[in-house]
Amino acid sequence: MAVQLLENWLLKEQEKIQTKYRELNRISVIEPSIIFIGDSIIEYYPLQELLGTSKTIVNRGIRGYQTGLLLKNLDAHLYGDAVDQIVLLIGTNDIGKDVPMSQALTNLESVIQSISRDYPLSQIKLVSILPVHQGEEYKQTVYIRTNEKIKAWNQAYQELASAYMQVEYVSAFEELLDQEG
């Protein structure tokens, strides 16, 4: 019961954010150079402040997002006529919700194909799924996500990216891994 209530709350929150993004896309007078799309890792990351670039960066992350939701609501995340790069970081919630890898890859490939069709001059950066801390104190947080599982997904992401000239796979997994995971 409590889990279902939390799931329903999260879906309503995601819908609010999608609506906000669609409205911002409609009224924005700023043309983005780079659009970051993904889950809470993107949503809560202060991109403009920490990347220190003069390019216009737009953050379109949504907490709890999965590849299926992204595919269904891709229009809420994309706008502009001269986008240089679109950065995708998504998948950890698919793993956490036990979405089959094949389904997530199908969703992600459809996202890539849609972006490629609508933004043929934009470079797509597919960022690897980030590692999780596998210490005892984080078991409830990471749930069924393990670094071994994430490695397998990242290998599949890399293979998917290599099938598209417009897509570059960006490995962040190894760079963020330490002895604790």
Region locations from a protein language model:
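N-terminal secretory targeting modules
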Residues: 1-36, 42, 46-53, 163-164
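Short hydrophobic segments within beta-strands
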Residues: 37-38, 127
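Oxyanion-hole/transition-state-stabilizing segment in secreted/luminal serine hydrolases
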Residues: 43-51, 69-106, 114, 129-137
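Short glycine-enriched, charge-decorated loop/helix-capping segments at active-site entrances
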Residues: 56, 100-102, 140-146
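A short beta-strand-loop structural module common to alpha/beta enzyme folds
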Residues: 56-68
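A short helix->loop->beta-strand "cap" motif at the edges of active sites that frequently abuts
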Residues: 119-123
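Substrate-gating cap/lid alpha-helix
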Residues: 135-171
